[in-house]
Amino acid sequence: MNTKETTSTQKLAIAGVLTAAAVAGSLISVPVVGSKCAPVQHMVNVFAAVMLGPWWGIGIAFCASLIRNLLGIGSLLAFPGSMVGALCCGLVFRLTRKLSLTCVAEALGTGILGGLAAYPVAKLLMGLAPAGFTVYMIPFFISTFTGSVLAFILLRVFEKSQVFLAARR
């Protein structure tokens, strides 16, 4: 097995673990303004950005959202929130390599862009009549802010203990 295959296998294994963590973590949720706010998904988005990059992060967010929906423990609103946030924080980490900016990008990407993207999903795919275009921004922001703070704290602790040293290369 060559190095490229080993790296791909390692990334796939990490993606599987992060997807499982996001699905299991979705059981820890708080209902806020008609949506399930699960901060663990947003923590996973930041972990994926740091360890794997934006495209893997989007894939993890999609798979976790799909699995949660198939298990009946999620809603279609999980897709725009988690995937937009994963893209934003993944791109910011790739460009800056700064954890603080990555966490801010996750919070703003999910809270604002994901919240806005959730409106047409709710209206067109779920048949809901949301009160306004920005109705999902506050609950999404509450969830993503909490998850981003958790990710920041945990990654700083892991960084000091050198847990993610090999994964960040």
Residue ranges and their predicted role:
Residues 1-169:
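Loop-helix junctions at membrane interfaces
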